Curated annotation (Swiss-Prot):
Pathway: Cofactor biosynthesis; biotin biosynthesis. It is an enzyme of class 2 (transferase). The gene is bioF. The modification N6-(pyridoxal phosphate)lysine is found at residue 236. GO terms for biological process: biotin biosynthetic process. Pfam families: Aminotran_1_2 (PF00155). Its cofactor is pyridoxal 5'-phosphate. Pyridoxal 5'-phosphate binds at residues 106-107, 176, 204, 233. Keywords: Biotin biosynthesis, Pyridoxal phosphate, Transferase. Belongs to the class-II pyridoxal-phosphate-dependent aminotransferase family. BioF subfamily. This is 8-amino-7-oxononanoate synthase. GO terms for molecular function: 8-amino-7-oxononanoate synthase activity; pyridoxal phosphate binding. It comes from Pseudomonas fluorescens (strain Pf0-1). Homodimer. Gene3D superfamilies: Aspartate Aminotransferase, domain 1 (3.90.1150.10), Type I PLP-dependent aspartate aminotransferase-like (Major domain) (3.40.640.10).
Length: 392
């Protein structure tokens, strides 16, 4: 029997779920060139506008001149360089924890943390809307795996009653497709009451949230005791690439010993760590970036509500517009693109069937005038979409 890949691809096309890669032909930012077309983009996650910051670029350039362009080996062989170590110490300071550990990607950080902490005989409990990397990590861990209702501490409590072995509760901090925040105080309360551990992937919270950009844990004023395992990514608000896990001395040493995605891969380029050190400095010192971003979020939500768009409960840079039908979401995205606006349509299986949406992401690099252009485009295109047959 052969693999019938053509049939699988044809079925995905027929369901309006076929994915294609746009080709970016310019630096990342609000104004981009995609597939040869100049566009105003509202779909990247460079939340604080640091990816093209001159000081970050210069830090990378200087780092490459001093350290070269490759990690050269895994961290446990000879790939753990001075910039890596300095960045780990800076991330530990940002999170207020004793240690932090660098990973090459957010996916690897989540997979490494979960599989190092639980296995056969243990339990993993996850929010139904967690990122795919967290769900994959839970399934691959070998532990008993179950999902609780979205952001529902009571649903979690019922599953905690049936948990066996070491129990790890895992949640996104900011949910990437809805933009809402995990109810960390309630989740931490239920988790601690049962002697379990809470792990938070705050990929979208670091930078935009917290008085100093420390993310959702800082936002809620929680401690390491509340959230023993804290994950962050560096490819979003930090504007670079990579990820980290922050926590106790024992946690980080355990990950060094047992996290296979950490052990068996080459370290990130030291120059990348140099760039991230500079972006971290800017993230913590340039508070105007968070303030400007919040101004844009308020502007967008007010304008979208006036148009009659169905928004979700989010005060983060992620602002989904619920459409429902995947075909209509794709059509609206295409209409906006014809007007020079790039907003991505998100469809199943990334989101549940019947909940296709446009996912607007705002950044500190956007201006109020650019957000107004988006709102005007949405008003015109949404009115046109409503006048078209539902099968369009």
């Amino acid at each position: 029997m052969s693999f019938d890949l053509a049939a699988r691809l044809a079925a995905r096309r027929a369901d309006n779920l076929y994915r294609q890669r746009p080709l970016l032909e310019s630096p990342q930012g609000p104004q981009v060139v995609v597939d040869g077309q100049p566009l105003l983009a509202f779909c990247n996650n460079d939340y604080l506008g640091l990816a093209n910051h001159p000081q970050v670029i210069e830090a990378w350039r200087a780092g490459a001149s001093k350290w070269g362009v490759g990690g050269g080996a895994s961290h446990l062989v000879i790939g753990h360089s001075g910039p890596h170590h300095e960045l780990e110490e800076a991330l530990a300071d940002l999170t207020g924890r004793p240690r932090a550990l660098l990973f090459t990607t957010g996916y690897m950080a989540n997979l490494g943390a979960v599989t190092a902490l639980v296995g056969q005989g243990d339990t993993v409990l996850e929010d139904r809307l967690n990122h795919a990397s967290l769900l994959d990590a839970g399934l691959l861990s070998g532990a008993r795996f179950n999902r609780y209702l979205h952001n529902d501490a009571d649903s979690l409590a019922k599953r905690l009653e049936k948990a066996t072995g070491n129990t790890l509760v895992v949640t996104d901090g900011v949910f990437s497709m809805d933009g809402d925040l995990a109810d960390l105080p309630a989740l931490a309360r239920e988790t601690k009451a049962k002697g379990a551990w809470l792990m938070v992937d705050d990929a979208h919270g670091f930078g935009p949230l917290g008085a100093n950009g420390g993310g959702i844990v800082e936002h809620f004023g929680l401690s390491q005791e509340d959230v023993p395992v804290l994950v962050g990514t560096l490819g979003k608000a930090f504007g670079t690439a990579g990820a980290f896990v922050a926590g106790s001395e024992e946690l980080i040493e355990s990950l060094i010993q047992f996290a296979r995605p950490y052990i068996y891969t080459t370290s990130q380029p030291p120059a990348l760590a140099c760039a991230t050190l500079k972006s971290l400095e800017l993230l913590r010192s340039e508070h105007w970036r968070r303030e400007h971003l919040q101004t844009l979020i308020r502007q967008f939500r007010h304008g979208a509500e006036q148009i009659g768009l169905e928004l979700m409960d989010s005060f983060t840079p992620i602002q989904p517009i619920l459409i429902g039908d995947a075909g209509r979401a794709v059509r609206l995205s295409q209409m906006l693109r014809e007007r020079g606006l790039m907003v991505t349509a998100i469809r199943p299986p990334t989101v549940p069937a019947g909940s296709a949406r446009l996912r607007v992401t705002l950044t500190a690099a956007h201006s109020e005038a650019q957000v107004q252009l988006l709102l005007e485009g949405l008003a015109d295109c949404f009115a046109q979409l409503k006048s078209e047959p539902s099968h369009a």
